[in-house]
From Swiss-Prot:
Assembly information from the UniProt record: Homodimer.
Keyword Coiled coil: no
Function: The enzymes which catalyze the reversible phosphorolysis of pyrimidine nucleosides are involved in the degradation of these compounds and in their utilization as carbon and energy sources, or in the rescue of pyrimidine bases for nucleotide synthesis.
Name of the protein described by the UniProt record: Thymidine phosphorylase
Gene: deoA
Entry EC number(s): 2.4.2.4
Organism: Yersinia pestis
Entry keyword Transferase: yes
Length: 440
């Protein structure tokens, strides 16, 4: 038997906590016997004193085990359970293509996703732009979709890592969100509760990233890879660029439209293709579905070329109560804003930098994201035809097309878009789309 205050005192004094002490505290959070003040105190001591690798693994496992851990054995699946998690960005629509692509190659992807957070878009919000799409199927339906389709993208239920929800809510109001051991445990508790064989992390770097610097992004990626592997889930991470919008669009319906066009081959943004392919390659290699990178890329290209990936996406949409002919008729189902027109720069120049976070907040301001958890979402608004770094813009070449539902919103966000994009006379040095692969 432990006392919560003694566990806090021990960590406050810089001593490592045992696995038993960590489990006691986390179960106390779940069972509401540890107070909000005690959660805040422990979070702050961890923020200042950090945690060793064994402590980080113990914290993650305790949070995972605070609720249901999915078990797929009874389904006798003939392939690995694999997933991807992104730290979030703008125009980061990779999940919608990646899940079907990997499923078409023989993987099973039980993806539990989130809503938009701050300036970053949420996969669930994007999918809810599809009429009827059910992000909360019951457990039996979820398992059946995974068995029959190979991929399902759903929201987190209250039974998965419930201690994390209360812990995170306290961190959010006590300035302890940006602690690497706590971020790591929060992300991985939910992912490991999926019962995965392998995981790939997409950790963003740059002006639209969650972590403000490259070194902090790298630290987070290494922490997640170390803890996840320590917890028995084969995990790698890619550091990918978020110094500009990843896709050609940012918003909900507009990104779903881009995802379908990507899968059918109608249009594939080169940067989006590079990141999506690289993440899929990691999933195929970690899951034992390919011999090497060349083999993985060939398999993935084949399911794009022969239409299997698009077919799997369509089957997932139908299985989750969306339209059965969505892939064929997406334009007749997705909402359209009343006003769509281009925004031009006030002078001619070459785009040298982008405040990607500000562009994400422009989508939120249009109604495409939430300022408060209870805010409704406008699925029709957003940005499309985003200009890239290094593009020369003038009176003919716009910065973006803004989709809004009234002229005032359009005018207001046109100013935000102009202010977020820096023009110069010289073409900027091209930055890599993928900075680094982390395996340990």
């Amino acid at each position: 038997m432990f006392l919560a205050q003694e566990i806090i005192r021990k960590k406050r004094d810089g001593q490592p906590l045992s696995e038993e002490e960590i489990r006691f505290f986390i179960n106390g959070i779940r069972d509401n016997v540890v107070s909000e003040g005690q959660i805040a105190a422990l979070a702050m001591t961890i923020y200042f004193h950090d945690m060793s690798m064994p402590e980080r693994v113990a914290l993650t496992m305790a949070m995972r085990d605070s609720g249901t851990v999915l078990n797929w054995k009874s389904l006798n699946l003939n392939g690995p359970l694999v997933d991807k998690h992104s730290t979030g960005g703008v125009g980061d629509v990779t999940s919608l293509m990646l899940g079907p692509m990997v499923a078409a190659c023989g993987g099973y992807v039980p993806m539990i996703s989130g809503r938009g957070l701050g300036h970053t878009g949420g996969t669930l919000d994007k999918l809810e732009a599809i009429p009827g799409f059910d992000i909360f199927p019951d457990d039996n339906a979820f398992r059946k979709i995974i068995q029959n389709v190979g991929v399902a993208i759903i929201g987190q239920t209250s039974s998965l890592a419930p201690a994390d929800k209360r812990f995170y809510a306290t961190r959010d109001i006590t300035a302890t969100v940006d602690s690497i051991p706590l971020i790591t445990a929060s992300i991985l508790a939910k992912k490991l509760a999926e019962g995965l064989d392998a995981l790939v992390m997409d950790v963003k770097v740059g002006s639209g990233a969650f972590m403000p610097t490259y070194s902090l992004s790298a630290d987070l990626a290494q922490a997640i890879v170390g803890v996840a592997n320590g917890a028995g889930c084969k995990t790698t991470a890619l550091l990918t660029d978020m110094n500009q919008v990843l896709a050609s669009s940012a918003g909900n319906g507009v990104e779903v439209r881009e995802a379908v066009r990507f899968l059918t081959g109608e249009y594939r943004n080169p940067r989006l293709l590079e990141v999506t392919m690289a993440l899929c390659v990691e999933m195929l290699l970690s899951g034992g579905l390919a011999h090497d990178e060349a083999d993985a890329r060939a398999k993935l290209q084949a399911v794009l070329d022969n239409g299997k990936a698009a077919e799997v996406f369509g089957r997932m949409v139908a299985a989750q109560k969306g339209p059965a002919d969505f892939v064929e008729r997406y334009d007749s189902y997705l909402p359209v804003a009343t006003l769509s027109k281009p925004v031009f720069a006030e002078q001619t120049g070459i785009i040298t930098a982008m405040d990607t976070r500000a562009l994400g907040m422009a989508v939120v301001a249009l109604g495409g994201g939430r300022r408060r958890a209870t805010d409704p979402i406008d699925y029709s608004v957003g940005l499309t035809e985003m200009a890239r770094l290094g593009t020369r813009v003038d009176g003919q070449q716009p910065l973006a097309v803004i989709h809004a539902n009234n002229e005032d919103d359009w005018q207001q966000e046109a100013e935000v878009v102009r202010a977020a994009i820096t023009l110069g006379n010289n073409t900027p040095e091209e930055t890599p789309v993928i900075y680094r692969r982390i395996t340990e």
